[in-house]
């Protein structure tokens, strides 16, 4: 039995040394140390030995089993290490190789235009004010000189959520809140960009949701000439120094007097073409002097303070600036369209 144990040990250790993969080692473990292996058979035959031989043979069996088990564990560890090293070597990245260029994205054209407009007015000392898109009827209409029975409410079809809550139809509501929240009732100089909503049918020039940017200035001794000068600076910054402006009388409930502002056509330079419908002028925004009722409702003394306001659609400005003929292009997310506006 002792000779057999030594022979089993030699064969097992030889097979372990020759093993090239983990599966082979597992086969050796099962063959020699498993329940049906020769080591187990030797242990079962211990009962046939004399009491004097059992301790010595038991110690020898344990020695052989531990030697095989220890060598198996060492070999498994070595093979696993070799496998890991081979895997790491195959996945090694040569950091000296030239990298692949990362394709950069770009601003959405509307985002770019809004930021350009903000930059122009911030350069003139304006602050950017924002507000909620879900608004109370009061701030969207009543605080802007549009009481519940005012016929001008029909000018804007509105998405109502409840009787007193709606999706704002203009960012003028931000102006109303800013004036009301100005506890000192002092000067204000803000622009208000944001999304607005109207029940329009979507077509080439209309959308049920669009971006609007409005401006408000409140101070003492504000005149119409201040409004005109501000808009002249804006137009020349956005469309070029050669652009001219003209103001036409109009009507808005929250301003008096009210005007529409046109700029000289950038396609024909005022001579008349299809873009400007032969007039040489293109309308871009509405404006006017803040109505005294609006000032009074916000807590201002309309005899001491005056103001002007203006509002424009970002899509309208972007369409003119980039020559886009359909407002829907801004919302279809066609990559071919958007990539044209990638900044250098």
From Swiss-Prot:
Q: What is its main location?
A: cytoplasm
Which coenzymes or cofactors are required? Mg(2+)
Gene Ontology molecular function: any one: tRNA binding
Q: What class of enzyme is it?
A: ligase
Positions bound to Mg(2+) = 256
What's the Enzyme Commission number for this chain? Answer: 6.1.1.20
Q: Which superkingdom heads the taxonomic lineage of this protein's source?
A: Bacteria
SUPFAM superfamilies, sorted? Class II aaRS and biotin synthetases, tRNA-binding arm
The note on cofactor binding and number reads: Binds 2 magnesium ions per tetramer.
**Swiss-Prot/TrEMBL GO biological process terms:** phenylalanyl-tRNA aminoacylation
Kindly state one GO CC term assigned in the UniProt record: cytoplasm
The alphabetical list of record keywords is:
Aminoacyl-tRNA synthetase, ATP-binding, Cytoplasm, Ligase, Magnesium, Metal-binding, Nucleotide-binding, Protein biosynthesis
Q: Which PANTHER family match?
A: PHENYLALANINE--TRNA LIGASE, MITOCHONDRIAL (PTHR11538:SF41), PHENYLALANYL-TRNA SYNTHETASE (PTHR11538)
Q: How does it assemble?
A: Tetramer of two alpha and two beta subunits.
NCBIfam families assigned: pheS
Q: What family does the database annotate?
A: Belongs to the class-II aminoacyl-tRNA synthetase family. Phe-tRNA synthetase alpha subunit type 1 subfamily.
* Name this protein carries in UniProt: Phenylalanine--tRNA ligase alpha subunit
Organism of origin: Bacillus cytotoxicus (strain DSM 22905 / CIP 110041 / 391-98 / NVH 391-98)
Upper lineage is: Bacteria, Bacillati, Bacillota, Bacilli, Bacillales
């Amino acid at each position: 039995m002792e000779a057999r144990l030594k022979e089993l040990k030699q064969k097992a250790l030889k097979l372990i040394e020759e093993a090239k993969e983990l599966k082979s080692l597992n086969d050796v473990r099962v063959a020699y140390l498993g329940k049906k292996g020769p080591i187990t058979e030797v242990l079962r035959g211990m009962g046939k030995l004399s009491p004097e031989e059992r301790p010595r043979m038991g110690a020898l069996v344990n020695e052989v089993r531990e030697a095989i088990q220890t060598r198996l564990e060492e070999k498994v560890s070595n093979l696993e290490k070799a496998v890991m090293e081979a895997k790491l070597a195959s996945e090694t990245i040569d950091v000296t190789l030239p990298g692949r260029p990362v394709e950069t994205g770009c601003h959405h054209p509307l985002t770019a235009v809004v930021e350009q407009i903000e930059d122009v007015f911030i350069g003139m000392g304006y602050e950017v004010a924002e507000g909620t898109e879900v608004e109370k009827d009061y701030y969207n209409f009543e605080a802007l000189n549009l009481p519940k029975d005012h016929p001008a409410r029909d000018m804007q079809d509105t998405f109502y959520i409840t009787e007193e809550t709606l999706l704002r139809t203009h960012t003028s509501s931000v102006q109303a809140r800013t004036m009301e929240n100005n506890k000192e009732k002092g000067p204000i100089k803000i622009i208000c960009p944001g999304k607005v909503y109207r029940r329009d049918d979507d077509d080439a020039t209309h959308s049920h949701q669009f971006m609007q940017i409005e401006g408000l200035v409140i101070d003492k001794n504000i005149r119409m000439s201040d409004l005109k000068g501000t808009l002249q600076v804006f137009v020349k910054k956005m469309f070029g120094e050669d652009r001219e402006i003209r103001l036409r009388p109009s009507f808005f409930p929250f301003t008096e007097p009210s005007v529409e502002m046109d700029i000289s056509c950038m396609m024909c330079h005022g001579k008349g073409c299809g873009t400007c419908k032969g007039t040489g002028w293109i309308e871009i925004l509405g404006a006017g002097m803040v109505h005294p009722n609006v000032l009074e409702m916000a807590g201002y003394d309309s005899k001491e303070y005056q103001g002007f306001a203006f509002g424009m659609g970002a899509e309208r400005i972007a369409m003119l600036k980039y020559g886009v003929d359909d407002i829907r292009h801004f919302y279809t997310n066609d990559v071919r369209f958007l990539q044209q506006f990638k900044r250098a």
